[in-house]
Swiss-Prot record:
PANTHER family: NUCLEOSIDE DIPHOSPHATE KINASE (PTHR11349). InterPro entries: NDK-like_dom, NDK-like_dom_sf, Nucleoside_diP_kinase, Nucleoside_diP_kinase_AS. The lineage of its organism: Bacteria, Pseudomonadati, Pseudomonadota, Alphaproteobacteria, Hyphomicrobiales. It catalyses: a 2'-deoxyribonucleoside 5'-diphosphate + ATP = a 2'-deoxyribonucleoside 5'-triphosphate + ADP; a ribonucleoside 5'-diphosphate + ATP = a ribonucleoside 5'-triphosphate + ADP. Belongs to the NDK family. The gene is ndk. GO terms for biological process: CTP biosynthetic process; GTP biosynthetic process; UTP biosynthetic process. This is Nucleoside diphosphate kinase. Homotetramer. Keywords: ATP-binding, Cytoplasm, Kinase, Magnesium, Metal-binding, Nucleotide metabolism, Nucleotide-binding, Phosphoprotein, Transferase. ATP binds at residues 11, 59, 87, 93, 104, 114. GO terms for cellular component: cytoplasm. It is found in: Cytoplasm.
Amino acid sequence: MAIERTFSMIKPDATKRNLTGAITKVFEDNGLRIVASKRVWMSKREAEGFYAVHKERPFFGELVEGMTSGPTIVQVLEGENAILKNREIMGATNPAQAAEGTIRKSFALSIGENSVHGSDAPETAAQEIAYWFAETEIVG
């Protein structure tokens, strides 16, 4: 098994409900180490840039609005097969379809307010990490 890094985000719907610690605990309890973390309030430009891949999707405006509505925790997680493990821990995008014990089943309010984001592939992880962090900010 390979030690890898992935990008993780705790979204405003969760931070506004003071769930940062509870969600962080789930990552750590499942063997993922937080090697970089910061609290940001995304600007419209940052949200549009980060989610540019969804620009033509009908939910893009709502997504940007939600992501700029409050503080967000951006993180780099490290561990064995971190990308897959994080995706399993998060659960399905739609919390109604997420497995019991996953972050989204436990904390998400809806498909639009699903509490967390995580990279889906090594290339995406590298891009998303670089969007928010300089290499010197990742210590682990």
